[in-house]
Amino acid sequence: MRRALLLVFGILLAAVADAQTSEVDLFRQLTPQHDMDSIEMKTLYLDVDALAFFKDNEFDGNIAKGYTLPGARLTPHLTYRPRPELSLELGLSALMYHGTNRYPNYAFHDIVTWKGGAYQGGAHLLPYFRATAQLGAATFVLGDLYGTAHHGLILPLYKPENLLTTDPEKGFQTLIRTRRWKMDAWIDWQSFIYEMDKHQEAFTVGMTQSVELLRPKAHGWALELPVQLMVQHRGGEQDDTDLGVQTLCNGSIGLQLRKTWNHRVLNAAEVEMHTLGAYQQAGKLWPFNTGAALW
């Protein structure tokens, strides 16, 4: 009986972990990936990234409210590669929800608060521009970033569902890929302010990197060391608010161990663990200044 209970517990634990991983993997597959090599030189392409979605979140309790996200995101854009190391993209990004034709006319950081007055009709529209330069193992991106689930952030640091609610990340990004090291560093400028503005400047700085400590050879074992960091800043010197500077830091370091087999049923197993830390460098958004956790 004890063995049966342990087996059931193990299956349930694996199911919960697999459900979380499946959601992350799903949003990662839905996110456009960086692949300059697939673009022919001096050829003009018309691409349309289209995503239709219906996501229902039902919660029981007082911690979070339930909500439903029915809609679509469209990004039609032209792509041109004038040189082997350079590609340019220009287009439009549109976010639409079923059941409404009015969208608040300001930056979307999550499910936005309706303020009335200033709004767009039909869809939440934004210009789309991306310049990508590839120099050896490094790739530099200016404009619309390869963002959201593309960064590979773990769930405690980033909610993949943001792909359905937030504006595309815009700013500057550096991607590095070597034989044993992968890095993604970026700054996402979320809110620009004018002189005497009524809201704060907002941007997020992030970094993910992974070092391959053990490569899967004949033994099938792979070991990686992932390090991740997110810094969110709210402030500015031109705004007309009394909120002060707000700076929140979250980071993690972990280990990922993977074993592969040549088997029809069980061909891979993976376990990972991360140590997380939080630090409120400035402001009073959190009721505490530091924190730590395991995931």
Predicted feature descriptions by range:
Residues M1-Q33:
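Cleavable N-terminal export/targeting peptides
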Residues R3, D49-F53, G71, Y128, ...:
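Exposed, low-structure sequence patches enriched in small/polar residues
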Residues Q20-G121, P127-A133:
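Beta-barrel outer-membrane channel/assembly domains of diderm bacteria
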Residues T21-S22, R28-L44, Y80-L88, A137, ...:
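Short loop/turn motifs that connect adjacent beta-strands in outer-membrane beta-barrel proteins
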Residues P70, G121-A123, T166, E201, ...:
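Short, glycine/acidic-rich beta->alpha junctions
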Residues T139-S210:
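Surface-exposed coil loops of outer-membrane beta-barrel proteins
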